[in-house]
Regions:
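Macromolecular interaction modules
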Residues: 1-117
């Protein structure tokens, strides 16, 4: 069985962009492109809640995409993703996606299996 993990992408809508347009592009175009990559199994998107644990908490980005991934090698996944950008299989739309600063991305390896209440 392949190791499981998460690929996280934190992003903002571009300055002056309509958030509905941003979300439509992200859901209908970008997330589907990422889901087409080998090993990407699912995606759930979130918006930063208005209340945080501590005043001022937040990563600076309003939106989070959580991709569930099963890969043997994270370096291969990163290479595949960069190749997909270079080949146009993964796209960005600077009209709706803030590119300065660029979205924050992180890859996490599973430490323990899912535990439920």
């Amino acid at each position: 069985m392949m190791p499981k993990g998460l690929f996280l992408a934190l992003a903002n809508a571009a300055d002056g962009a309509n958030h509905d347009d941003f979300n439509q592009w992200y859901d209908d175009v970008h997330a589907k492109e990422v889901l087409s990559l080998p090993g990407v199994k699912a995606c759930t998107r979130y918006k930063l809640a208005g209340t945080q644990m501590l005043e001022g908490d937040g990563a600076g980005q309003q939106y989070l995409a959580v991709y569930e991934v099963e890969v043997d090698d994270w370096a291969d996944f990163q290479t595949e993703m960069m190749n997909a950008f270079g080949e146009g299989r993964l796209t960005v739309n600077p009209d709706v996606l803030q590119m300065d600063p660029v979205p924050t991305t992180m890859m996490f390896e599973e430490v323990t299996p899912r535990v439920e209440a």
